[in-house]
Amino acid sequence: CILSNTCVAQITPDNTLPIDTRVLNQGETKVIEGGTQAGKNLFHSFEEFSVLGGQTAYFNNSVNIQNIITRVTGKSSSNIDGTLRSNGAANLFLINSNGITFGASASLDIGGSFVGTTASSIKFEDGSKYSAVEPQTPLLTISTPIGLQFGANPAPIRNQSQASPNGATNYYNSPEGLRVSPGKTLALIGGDIYLESGSLTAPLGQIELGSVGSNSFVNLIPTSGDWIFEYKDVKNFKNIQITSKNLSNSSNITTSGQSGSGNIHVIGNIIEIFGVGGILNLTLGDKDAGDIVIDANKLTLQDGAQILAGTVGKGTGGNLTINASNVDVLGGSYTEFDFFAISAIGSTTYKDGNAGNVNINTKTLRVKDGGNIVVESSGINTPESLFKDVLPATGNAGNLTINATQLVEIIGKSPETNSSLSATTLGSGNAGKLTVNTGKLIVNNGGEIKVGSRVITNSIGKYLGDRFNLGRAGNLDITANSILIDNQGKITSETDLGQGGNITLQTQLLQMRRNSLISTSAGKIQSSGDGGNIIINARNGFIVAARNQNNDIIANGFSGSGGKIIINASGILGIEALNREDLIRKIGSNDPSQIDPQKLSTSDISAISQTNANLDGVVSITNPDVDSSSGLVNLPEKPNVPTITQACKADNTRQNKFSIVGRRGLATNPTEFLRNTTIPDTDWISVENSTMQYPFQQSQTTTYNNINSVIEAQAWKVDKDGTIILTSTAPKIIPHSKPFVAPAC
């Protein structure tokens, strides 16, 4: 064929195959024919392969082809700003070890799956390989691809695609970017991966992002027409960065579809998601959603970035699993439409289906500046009043489990929301369970850990759900060596209406400071509901609250019953239990809305019904060393002088005496006045740091014949092996301080 210079410069066959690839120039369409077929595999080989904006690279394959395997053997990267197209349901592999960039107009028009990779070769089941760096004539195979082999320095992959062919958008009303057909796989496997306001869409299918290091091998495990990507032979990973300019030009990764959704897997060393956008997976119909799995050394979400799974139909939402040594969820940002986007990880049901679970396995988790991690039974906006009237969901929320071996920090707030871990319900669905297992937990500066049931009303104050069928608050279980709640930090399981949930804390040290709160109160809007239970088990540890800083442990019900508070601890300091009478007396009012220990400056424990004394709850405190509610011990008016022996009992072979020596410096009777003249002004003197005797005579050992008596120990010393030895004589010592010498002793 006769090719233009532009065509030759962009798509150039390298003539290394038994049957060479041919490129036909048909206007803005570059028709790719020929190539070498082996069974259901069709091989193409190019020296250069790039597609300009507005152009189409059309692989004109026969419909019986299963895999189109395309390699680039030259030294330049592939820049795809147009469309890649193929016939039938063939899968398309694009292999360029120099790098691949998808521009803002890049799109896919293929019936099968797409794998874009910067691997150096692809390996087949029979052991053969198709190499992009060793372009000699290969022995082509009819075998199935089983792996991607990378070189010493895998090149990056960039996606900037905001393509919307025929105006199509995804569920979030954003451009689809690179999109495959429903049920198919979209995979980018390379070195560093960048999504720069670029989106990936695979409705009901699978999205795979893998960032691998030098000499890695990624296994392709065939399934029914697709693959599972396995990284067991990868020794090190590279980084993935997902950024969004704004809401209109955001990076979205989604497999959401009308009848379900697929799976999303992202794996790398450092994974960063910045700006409004992220990884989003919803099922919109009756089928269940797929799962989201993130594997990383460090994961960061910031400035409104989100990883969310959910359901807007009857189908069950997918599970979200994060495995990363460090996880940071930071802040949020205002969008160009002037609403606040929260950085969040979560799972939500908006309608009838149950939400999936969220599991985070890490060493350290930090949620700061208004970031959220949430599982929720939420609601959906009614079409006639978007963002105003919410029809509550009936599906149940999922469970949230945090396993952080070292540290969990929930700290701070944004202008719109507090940093939080939460499992809540807004309607008839039940809230999920929230579990935190960590070495150290810090909830500070307005941070919250909460489960609960909340009521959302419309613009005229009406609740649109079933008021008589409200979901239950979930339970909250925390196990940590130490727990610090500080500066308006909260751990709560509260309800606006209905039954409060339960809180169980297992710890060795619980510290509460500056308006901190642990609460399972119910009926927050002055309605019915029983307070939940609080169990704090610090059997070998301590509970320490700063006095007069309004730190409270509460299990109150407004018109329902108070809950139970059970505390097992070795010591309880700075906080005391108050009953109804105590609260009324201290607050100075018996108004039920005022009988609340949070209105006091003291640190208190309370489990009452605010309206009905017969429904008060129970506070049980076991084995405290200090009972702060017992007050001071009364001393006798005339103290007795007891006879006390502080040494061995004297035998008849010794003489014993007790003397008080001095110039009335110490009174012999506690009723005698201590006058200021009894203690003279005396100077301190320095003593040389040398070996010296005490200023009394060392006792002499006396031998008694035929008397087998016990000699009272006069001192003790430590042998070199750590053994403590009692001695009958006082030792020589080296003083380390300046002793006080009274002038007249």
Feature-to-residue mapping (PLM):
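Extracellular and secretory-pathway beta-repeat/beta-biased strand scaffolds
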Residues: C1-C745
